[in-house]
Amino acid sequence: MIVLIVSGIALLTLKYASIQSRHYSDSYLKEQAELFLLSSTEAALLAISGYDRQKHNNCLRQINVISPDGRFKVNITAEKYFLFHGKDYNESGEVPWPSSCSDLNESIGRKESHGMVLIKAVVENNSTMLKDNPIRIVRRSLQWP
């Protein structure tokens, strides 16, 4: 009888330990995905700020980033560009906004907010590498490149 009780307690302890281990693993992967999402968003803002819209006659709409280890992929979409009176400016003054991006242009009346971008960033795990725990995090933010 005592052997049954001890084996039952041991079985419950092992089951709890495996559940706890899986929880730590899931939490670690989710934190890694969130950190990669944040760094990818910063990289996208850097790409947007350095992109010459007049030279290319368009604007950046989509930026895709894959983690170096291949575990995660991030899709970043620029949904709106907020421009003072709907016009673009650079060092030499007012420049035309590319006509191919007119659907992304949102005219605003505050010069202080000129150039802000509404970004949607989605991070997902690579389904071939992490099959057990699907991760998908969506973030929308208003950023200033």
Residue ranges of each PLM-predicted region?
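N-terminal single-pass transmembrane signal-anchor helix
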Residues: M1-T13
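Conserved functional hotspots that engage anionic ligands or polymers and/or phospholipid headgroups
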Residues: L11-T13, S21-L35, S39-P145
